[in-house]
Amino acid sequence: MTASAPAASASARLLDGRRIAEELLDGLKLRVDARLAAGKARPGLAVVLVGGDPASSVYVRNKRRAAEKVGIEAFDYDLPQGTSEAQLASLIDELNADPKIHGILIQLPLPGIPDANRLIQRIDPRKDVDGFHPQNVGHLALREFGLRPCTPRGIVTLLGHTDQPVRGRNATIVGVSNHVGRPMGLELLIAGCTVTSCHKFTPPDVLEASVRNADILVVAVGRPGLIPGEWVKPGAVVIDVGINRLDDGRLVGDVGFDAAAQRAAWITPVPGGVGPMTVATLMQNTIEAADAAESGDSGLGIG
């Protein structure tokens, strides 16, 4: 059963990631149809899943469904628990060399693999549709848009669906993971924000002050209720990346939703906010990787 998103108060408007993602996917399907009509190859996405972790299986299923919806061919590699790093490295080499594959997705975490970064770095950066390869993150740091990390790019798309400006705003990011927090800071810097990043070494009083000052607040830690909604600046845009399952089965974010919704101008629900945008952006990256492969582009300037 699909969890339902909370309803916002009369103060905040919901940034409905499900609806916006569906609109993005509809547009991507048109792009794939146009490619095929022009005699170009169907975009191909290799999806690698190791083990049977229930959460990872759900995420992979959602990605495969999105690929089918837009007309991307998904090549499924469901590998058993205990698959070694050497076996995965060999598979990545095969996928790098396969012209039918335009994007490679390695579902994280990888059970039994202590350092997944070595495998991520083995992926051809031109096929790194998650946007995790150091070369792609480096291009983002240099403001050379190529294959960008999916969640931050999806959040930028969400921000574009509000009536609030982004340029010139104070943005606070809570959480500095390699896949969300750090590249999110780069995205917001490029967009013209003054960015504050908070992390486990940020003193509590500084964290609170930074949140209270934020016109745009992005929280990506994975701790339910970490940010009290009362801290949210009136009129802010709140992007809650966290998704946490409580003992009673409810899914909640990192921000106290009810109180935050009384103060914010816009807020993402959990679930139904950032997650669908991450999946849709993965499809966007895959199509752009296919376009770049057709044109001989090294991967720069495609997004």
Swiss-Prot record:
GO molecular-function term, one example from the UniProt record: methenyltetrahydrofolate cyclohydrolase activity
An example Gene Ontology biological process: methionine biosynthetic process
Pfam family of the protein (one): THF_DHG_CYH_C
Keyword Oxidoreductase found: yes
Gene for this chain: folD
Matching InterPro entries: Aminoacid_DH-like_N_sf (IPR046346), NAD(P)-bd_dom_sf (IPR036291), THF_DH/CycHdrlase (IPR000672), THF_DH/CycHdrlase_cat_dom (IPR020630), THF_DH/CycHdrlase_CS (IPR020867), THF_DH/CycHdrlase_NAD-bd_dom (IPR020631)
Protein name from the UniProt record: Bifunctional protein FolD
Subunit structure: Homodimer.
